[in-house]
């Protein structure tokens, strides 16, 4: 089993503003490239995938999106998180005709085939809790947001087939 530290302070964005979903995806993915978690191809791949298979989730009062791209574009697994000052419209995963005003984005980069299924399952348990999401939006500092996320993700299992490993 692999347990990874999936978070990097440089990939946590608090109270940011984006023009639209594509701007958010490009900005977050570019930060992943700059920190060598993903290949440059990840930027276009995550945008293309979002257009074809939307990731907006109607999770209640605070909507989220969980964009991701194929593992072949990833060097090392990570999660980038953005809390948005103003909502950005993402298409609903279950109804692509519907726009959702998203306030939280969890961008996934998974380096193992099929590992994203486990990560998505674990993440779904987190994003369905409105109090948890509100706590992320209310984080008063970048460091506080990072610590809250670190607590949330400390036991996320990425791949059940491998030996225990930690990377940062």
Predicted regions and their residues:
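Cytosolic covalent-transfer regions centered on His/Cys nucleophiles
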Residues: 1-168
